Amino acid sequence: MTTIQHSGNDVIISFAGHLDTATSVEANLKISRELEKMVSIDSLTCDAMKLEYISSSGLRILLSLAKRHKDFRVINVQPQVYEVLETTGFTKIMTVERAMRRLSVEGCKLIGIGSVGKVYRLDGDTIIKVFREGTTMENVRREITLSKEAFVLGMPTAISFDIVKVVPSNQDEEERYGLIYELLKATTLGAYLKQHPEQIDECARKYADLFKQMHEIEVPEGGNIPSAVQHERQQIEHIRRYFPEESISMMLCILDSIPAGNQLLHLDLQTKNVMVQDGQLMLIDMGEVGYGHPLLDLGHSYSSMVSLIGDYEKTIGIPRELGQRFWNQAIEYYFEGLPAETIEERKKQIEVVSCIRNFSWLALSDSFPETVIEECKTMFDERVAQRFDYIKEVCKTFSNWTL
């Protein structure tokens, strides 16, 4: 059976059962009649979720559609049909997406929280990152693309081997996307520090080295990695609903003072979204990666590890005192070898830049509780408005931080 739907100029053709000699003639006629009625077609998608079998006559229908429509894809392909498409080479000449497995994380241990979702341990070999509600497939693909680019540039980044749908634990929730990673005996950096507090110094050095490794990588032009400053500006614009124009202007003033740069930045490097595997640090959350000046990256991490607003241990995974001590040791290692006065100046610069992230993170969701929003407004007055003369003076020194 073949059904055809369209929304505007976007067409979805759904196949069910068998697409073979007995059914393909009727299916092809139906498709042709419906498509001829349309003035223009922007995209054409074939949904194969219920397609059980495809023969050469069915393949000819797909090939004909692919030749006539530039934006063409076949989605939700079941294993037995995908095998046919792969064997015949169709997966190389058109976009073909497998049907996603559906998994539940009920009963799975929560091991990490990042800017875009939560990480659970599925079993001894694999973990799953579950994206927050509202994340689109386009967002998921973007993160996979950024992860691959960061990996190619030299970052220790885990690459997902499967996209799945995560079944909600109750009826009020929607299905979410998840990424599966194979990480043997891996745990979060936060959990590792709680289990091995005596290794805080060693971990702080590795954390600092991870930052330095990233910040030595220059992002080439023309890739998919976006400008971190432009992304930050968009987030500030997104929170205008919560803050008056004067407050927005203060945040933009800090942002506009940050020097230009093309270094690779993670922008959410904190202890609950970095994994430890065989003593090495591994990144799995690349949803905010961008390029720019390291000052912005370190400011983001300071806002999490030192000046986080809200429940610190729930978000970061360790007590605030341990997290701040860890950060202080790590930043000393990051600046190791620089004159003491330079280090002191850069620490002040990082603290000032963190004042942006302390509030721009509200752009990550449209459903934060009113109590959280009010706490942020109160803290803005304390951390930014009342100190703005001092902040402006520190901003004048940003240009001293040359790359």
Feature names for model-found ranges:
Residues 298-338, 354-371:
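Active-site activation/catalytic loop segments of kinase-like enzymes and analogous catalytic loops
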Residues 274-298:
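Catalytic activation segment of kinase domains across protein kinase-like and atypical kinase folds
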Residues 109-222, 259:
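ATP-binding pocket architecture of kinase catalytic cores
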Residues 341, 357-403:
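ATP/Mg2+ or Mg2+-diphosphate-binding catalytic cores
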Residues 1-14:
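Short beta-strand/loop segment at the start of cytosolic alpha/beta domains
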Residues 165, 216-267, 271, 277, ...:
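An alpha-helical support segment within catalytic cores of ATP-dependent transferases
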